[in-house]
């Protein structure tokens, strides 16, 4: 079933010379080892936040290994981490700006030709200024990333929300963590987990909800496995819509019908109440109850019949207060019998799961990832798991924790904490709150009224607005939405190729997105720049620049800041705004945002000796330090405290809030969290009354389900060897050879009934599109009958041509786990 590495799609004369095979090699001999220089850095891949030691020689990364001093991974890596040294050296690395041209000038139908950075910024400025003049700030936008460094995301946020006055900036974390964000915000009034990875060694029970930790968070899974095999009382429950590698450790394996996790969660709450397992003292002191809006729609276009039918599509994130008695009545219909019947999970397993949570002598950690979050009711699923932990009081203490795991290295640190979502500002502030806008404007030293009140376009909406011609200039960095976005052919590609639009992609390789763009900017990656990530346990980690980027590639930070020099306030701010700050009139956005007396206050001499820093060389001051310290001002004294900049280069990361030099492992609990008042025990201080909310939320069906024409469920996701769209891992020969192609995992009986067999080539067809791939009936993923699983890493099998662009109406996060498809035979094999 292995196939040769496919030829990259045609990429223009300027990119000529791209070989068919992309190789990366860094063989190290014993004699070479003595000349290696080692430094620490967080891994470039997932949100676990492993630390690695990076070896450089002659200006190149030549080796990596797990950092034995790191608390997260304790010296080990997953298979992707072991090949980190090769991700930067694929032979099709982008090294020059490339513009679509014909007859020496830009042409949207032209071929890519190399240009200078000066020319690139010239046409970008021309397009941005024309759109802003013609249609205002709503016509420009940016799609960023949970892979941005902290200061890259912060600089982008400032440039768009303050400089260009457009809230149309959103990260690809919208696709992966937005439901977790809104779940935290609704239940606790603050974002991010209250626990930490130390819970793993302290708990008696692990419950995985829609999380294949064995492949997606393998280093954490090794810690879970060690705990399970070392302590006989420890139990592991795994819930998913299909069987995967995490089931190998499960004491309670449960495959449920798609969307019925909502029923199971409400059943557990009902069981806790009816069995007398409610922690009455905890609930009375620390919890209040609310009934959330129901029938809230599916985040589709407003003219979609499902949206027209929904009663509360415009009131999705609203609720009314109720009491405990009303909540108990609400969950009462979610009986064991009903739950077993509708979920397909045997009753005895459901009851055993409920008992894990109900037993007052047993500690429980709940882990979840995309199975919960990529869900049309993902926010509800998050709220419902918090309900269970709050009813039992199993929260905010060692071994008792509801824990949302992140998929990107800085989805927490950059997307969430920095606030690069279209509705957010740093440290949980939001653009719709006038006091929050005032705080940001004061810290940023811009006039009152600079930041717009209206929420910008979220990720899926950006694609729709590009298609509709509302959004006309679009810049993406560290993302590959043409492969990762939903419903690509109907809702993503049309907007990118709309002749009225201009699309810029900053990336390191010619991804599917890059090849659909008008202008490609070559970016520096990982240790080619100084950076900071924030992982899933609130741990902020720094690294130094260790090598130079190839050719003319530049960091995303340099691109953003240098581009800001192309605008003056007169060109982008209205006269009434400038009248409030006449001293800013005529200044560039670079002067206003980045030479503002705060960002530029740290001299180049503050840089640690012996390290390069291309941005310090370019701008003449320690811009990373200045951006970080300005950003940190948002959270200090408000429960989001970060340590001083220099502390992070010394440590293997620190978990916020960091107060008086001490990190916080468990939030909201007295004795661990410095923000909790003495004698209170627990304070959920995100809300003024310092109480968390338990939500009454029902089961509601998915946006699309199998029928006679499309009889299978489709779920998408990842595999161990590849990360997201494979733009890095597919260029590592060892990882590519291990898993060269995306496969259609299906039940053997389904294959037999369709007259297929393992290796058969099929079409996966939905109402939106189709792909070709081969069938796999054995191996790591074992779907139940009626469901197929296809990973999305393969650029030659774009499964997101098939997926539905339904989202959670509260979080606006896409549901990649549930749509209807049919399977058609092409070649039997």
Swiss-Prot record:
| A cellular component term, taken from the record's GO annotations | periplasmic space
Alphabetical GO biological process terms: cellular respiration; Mo-molybdopterin cofactor biosynthetic process; nitrate assimilation
Name what cofactor the protein needs.
[4Fe-4S] cluster; Mo-bis(molybdopterin guanine dinucleotide)
- Keyword Hydrolase listed? The answer is no
* Superkingdom assignment: Bacteria
EC number from the UniProt entry? 1.9.6.1
In its keyword annotation, does this UniProt entry include Signal?
A: yes
| Cofactor binding comment, as recorded | Binds 1 [4Fe-4S] cluster.
For this protein, the record's SMART domains field holds:
Molybdop_Fe4S4
**What does the UniProt keyword field contain?**
4Fe-4S, Electron transport, Iron, Iron-sulfur, Metal-binding, Molybdenum, Nitrate assimilation, Oxidoreductase, Periplasm, Signal, Transport
Q: Which InterPro entries match?
A: Asp_de-COase-like_dom_sf (IPR009010), CT_Nitrate-R-NapA-like (IPR041957), MoPterin_dinucl-bd_dom (IPR006657), Mopterin_OxRdtase (IPR006656), Mopterin_OxRdtase_4Fe-4S_dom (IPR006963), MopterinOxRdtase_cofactor_BS (IPR027467), Periplasm_NO3_reductase_lsu (IPR010051), Prok_molybdopt-oxidoreductase (IPR050123)
Signal peptide position in this chain?
1-30
A molecular function annotated in GO for this UniProt entry is: 4 iron, 4 sulfur cluster binding
In which residues is [4Fe-4S] cluster bound? 43, 46, 50, 78
List localization entries.
Answer: Periplasm
Q: Which residues bind Mo-bis(molybdopterin guanine dinucleotide)?
A: 80, 147, 172, 176, 209-216, 240-244, 259-261, 370, 374, 480, 506-507, 529, 556, 716-725, 800, 817
Binding positions for substrate?
792
Q: Which family does it belong to?
A: Belongs to the prokaryotic molybdopterin-containing oxidoreductase family. NasA/NapA/NarB subfamily.
Q: How does it assemble?
A: Component of the periplasmic nitrate reductase NapAB complex composed of NapA and NapB.
Q: What does this protein do?
A: Catalytic subunit of the periplasmic nitrate reductase complex NapAB. Receives electrons from NapB and catalyzes the reduction of nitrate to nitrite.
What protein does this entry describe? Answer: Periplasmic nitrate reductase
- Organism encoding this protein: Pseudomonas aeruginosa (strain ATCC 15692 / DSM 22644 / CIP 104116 / JCM 14847 / LMG 12228 / 1C / PRS 101 / PAO1)
